[in-house]
């Protein structure tokens, strides 16, 4: 027997189960959104991304029968063969042949018992029935299935995709900075005013670190703006996550006031110095720039090996009034602000438009409902006229990567404290050279004169 054949069989054993499993049951538009929806015969370029870095196929070769495997896209049968596959997706209550067999339906585990499939009823992050109702109903926003969220439980999403703990009473009651109103345009986008000084959308991954990611994102933007671009680093959310662990919960959430305390007292290095890794590990990790290193004569050492270990500090944060006009004026004058809001189960499926929380999950029962606090950057505002009725919105940058929402951004109803989006809004100024500090003090004095 040739030596090569010894190694061929194990490889085939690994490949066949993957193909035979296929991508069936993952809702969403795949073949149907291609320019040329389906391809005749075999076409290895007739693909659509699915489940992160995987590909599914829309060519007639993708379904090679039970022995040949199946790597077709989930909507292949409906789009390319015109078959109604709705009934095929129902598992719970259907008959089965072997007691003890198990299947997965989205995030649910289904077991064959007494000749019938019984699923455990776990609420999933992607709920196909809600997707369908949003698609066919009259809503101000659209929804879609995200392959990165498919197969994940709702509780898992709340735990690892959010991460801001509800502010303590003393923090909620902090004094608000009042701002003299100014003439406000119908639309404003910080990216238009400050361009490259506004940093791109982050991706917190599977770590409940929005408390860290949003704080460093706001700091990065504000430092760049107040320094007029002389400081334009993306600050390290990993350092804040790993090193600010006193009374924090790492990848299971944190308090914004303690995050701001750390960045004010010690400062945070750039992301190039201390890159983000917790999105894959689900752990905050050990602090690689301990507090004692700040007094080291040799300076801080970058975990990445970079020679640039400059640490940047911020001034004490301030709470912006919850009045719509005050938030707008602060945003247009000083840059993006940090907002905490309540994320409900349907928000995970947001694709575009002006988000307004629906009661579709509540209609199904309490087990389909969940919520948690999340913090994001607010970059601007506008008015949506697409539905025939003007809808005011806030423009926000989420931290779920650019594949989610509108390239990582979302719009949410403005002026009604929807999902508490206007209840806890934070701003801060960056610390820099003495010249910049004097500039900020003069700026503060000008603000104080406004209020006299």
Curated annotation (Swiss-Prot):
One of its GO terms (biological process) is proteolysis. It holds the Pfam family Peptidase_C1. Belongs to the peptidase C1 family. It is found in: Secreted. It comes from the Eukaryota. Residues 1-20 form the signal peptide. One of its GO terms (molecular function) is cysteine-type peptidase activity. GO terms for cellular component: extracellular space; lysosome. Glycans are attached at residues 145, 232. SUPFAM superfamilies: Cysteine proteinases (SSF54001). Keywords: Disulfide bond, Glycoprotein, Secreted, Signal. This is Uncharacterized peptidase C1-like protein F26E4.3. Residues 34-85 form the SMB domain. Disulfide bonds join 38-46, 38-58, 46-80, 56-58, 56-73, 62-72, 73-80. The keyword Cytoplasm does not apply. The keyword Glycoprotein applies.
């Amino acid at each position: 027997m040739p030596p090569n054949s010894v190694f061929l069989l194990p490889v085939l054993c690994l490949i066949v189960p993957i193909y035979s499993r296929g991508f069936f049951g993952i809702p969403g538009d795949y073949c149907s959104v291609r320019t040329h929806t389906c391809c005749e015969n075999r076409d290895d370029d007739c693909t659509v991304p699915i489940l992160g870095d995987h590909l599914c196929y829309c060519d007639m070769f993708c379904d090679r029968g039970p022995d040949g495997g199946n790597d077709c896209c989930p909507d292949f049968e409906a789009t390319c063969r015109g078959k109604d596959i709705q009934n095929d997706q129902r598992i719970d209550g259907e008959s089965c042949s072997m007691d003890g067999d198990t299947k997965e339906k989205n995030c649910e585990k289904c077991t064959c018992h007494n000749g019938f499939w019984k699923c455990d009823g776990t609420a999933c992050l992607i709920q196909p029935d809600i997707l369908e109702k949003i698609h066919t109903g009259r809503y101000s926003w659209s929804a879609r299935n995200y392959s990165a969220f498919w197969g994940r439980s709702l509780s898992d999403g709340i735990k690892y995709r959010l991460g801001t703990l509800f502010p303590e009473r003393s923090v909620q009651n902090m004094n608000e900075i009042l701002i003299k109103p100014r003439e406000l345009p119908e639309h404003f986008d910080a990216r238009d005013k400050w361009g490259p000084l506004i940093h791109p959308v982050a991706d917190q991954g599977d770590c409940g670190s929005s408390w860290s990611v949003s704080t460093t994102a706001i700091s990065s933007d504000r430092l760049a703006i107040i320094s007029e671009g002389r400081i334009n680093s993306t600050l390290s959310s990993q350092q804040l996550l790993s090193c600010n662990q006193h009374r924090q919960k790492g990848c299971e959430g944190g308090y914004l006031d303690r995050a701001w305390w750390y960045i004010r007292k010690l400062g945070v290095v750039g992301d190039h110095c201390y890159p983000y890794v917790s999105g894959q590990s689900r752990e905050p990790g050990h602090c690689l720039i301990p507090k004692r290193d700040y007094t080291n004569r040799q300076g801080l050492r970058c975990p990445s090996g970079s020679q640039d270990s400059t640490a940047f500090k911020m001034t004490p944060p301030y709470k912006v009034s919850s009045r719509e006009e005050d938030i707008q004026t602060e945003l247009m004058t000083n840059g993006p602000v940090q907002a905490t809001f309540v994320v409900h189960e349907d928000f995970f499926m947001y694709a575009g438009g002006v988000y307004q929380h629906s009661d579709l999950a509540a209609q199904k029962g309490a087990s389909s409902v969940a919520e948690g606090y999340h913090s994001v950057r607010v970059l601007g505002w506008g008015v949506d006229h697409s539905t025939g009725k003007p809808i005011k919105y806030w423009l926000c940058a989420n931290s779920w990567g650019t594949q989610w929402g509108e390239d990582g951004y979302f719009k949410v109803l403005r002026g009604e404290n929807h999902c508490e989006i206007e209840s806890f809004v934070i701003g801060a100024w960056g610390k820099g050279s003495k010249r910049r500090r004097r500039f900020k003090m003069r700026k503060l004095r000008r603000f104080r004169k406004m209020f006299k």
